[in-house]
Amino acid sequence: MRVLAAMSGGVDSSVAAARMVDAGHDVVGVHLALSTAPGTLRTGSRGCCSKEDASDARRVADVLGIPFYVWDFAEKFQADVIDEFVSAYARGETPNPCVTCNQKIKFSALSAKAVALGFDAVATGHYARLSGGRLRRAVDKDKDQSYVLAVLSAEQLRHAAFPIGDTPKPQIREEAARRGLAVAEKPDSHDICFIPSGNTRAFLGERIGVRRGAVVNADGTVLAEHDGVHGFTIGQRKGLGIAGPGPDGRPRYVTAIDADTATVRVGEAADLDVREMLGRAVVFTSGTAPSGPFECAVQVRAHGETADAVAELVGDELVVRLRAPLRGVAPGQTLALYRHDPDGDEVLGSATIAGTSR
């Protein structure tokens, strides 16, 4: 099998590439250049997509004895990931750019180019498993990345390979060291790769500008002014611009964002509870939507807990009714669906949260 190994320069993708070589596949390594301007992607060894990371990936490819290339996907990354990230926050939503990158870049643009060049699969260092064509959680639940892959279609998964999903992260590092890979102890990336400073509010402010509005309580009383809804997300407690807790002494949280009126509403923790979610851009990883309501477990954050629910496709929207309230759910987040069984490992699909109700 001809395999294109996506190599970020980190330990996970490096071991993934090595395992594909060990399996006897015809492997070619590729690193994606995603920066459109100097300084837009972090430098150093903590992230992906920097020049240092490209050099690390090349050195690993040399050790493995495989061809290696750097492909320029900067313009598409800017349009499909960065610009959409900014637009979503301007709409008062809370997106996950890693989800978008997987859906639009790694398993769409990259995969399409790979197939056009005669490759059978794209191998990545994601912590997830494929079994019988079905996407499943990784063995290492702490590192599991099935959530950010739940947006992939059956066709996208058909050309994907996740060689390290059956191994805990500590063993991956040990394996890299045994193989003599210099990235064995390279730190993991935790922040958004295109926000080197880690200051998301400042990054968004530079691109959206000032759009002043009001912070109000549940009855509409104005408590403060703000410079833009992009500085807030559902469940946020700090940086609200209001003095201390509410009159009852309880902390206040962002409970709703109206981008049209630039209004941010705050309330108590209990006001964050939701019992129903509406999803758009629905994807079922099997390629077939269940008929009628179905039991499932839902996850709304990359490493969040799952919650039992009943979901149903109504037209082109997904209606999800929770068995118990879920707190702090924001429009724009990805809603991942898992099979409701003792293991809870199989990914059924996903949707983008369009709205919630109590």
Swiss-Prot record:
ATP binds at residues 6-13, 32, 125. Belongs to the MnmA/TRMU family. GO terms for cellular component: cytoplasm. Catalyzes the 2-thiolation of uridine at the wobble position (U34) of tRNA, leading to the formation of s(2)U34. Its EC number is 2.8.1.13. Disulfide bonds join 101-193. The active site is at residues 101, 193. The keyword Protein biosynthesis does not apply. One of its GO terms (molecular function) is tRNA binding. This is tRNA-specific 2-thiouridylase MnmA. Residues 143-145 are annotated as: Interaction with tRNA. Transmembrane segments: none annotated. One of its GO terms (biological process) is tRNA wobble position uridine thiolation. It comes from Mycobacterium avium (strain 104). It catalyses: S-sulfanyl-L-cysteinyl-[protein] + uridine(34) in tRNA + AH2 + ATP = 2-thiouridine(34) in tRNA + L-cysteinyl-[protein] + A + AMP + diphosphate + H(+). InterPro entries: MnmA-like, MnmA-like_C, MnmA-like_central, MnmA-like_central_sf, Rossmann-like_a/b/a_fold. CDD domains: MnmA_TRMU-like. The keyword Methyltransferase does not apply. It is found in: Cytoplasm. The record marks 126, 333 as: Interaction with tRNA. Keywords: ATP-binding, Cytoplasm, Disulfide bond, Nucleotide-binding, RNA-binding, Transferase, tRNA processing, tRNA-binding. NCBIfam families: PRK00143.1, trmU.
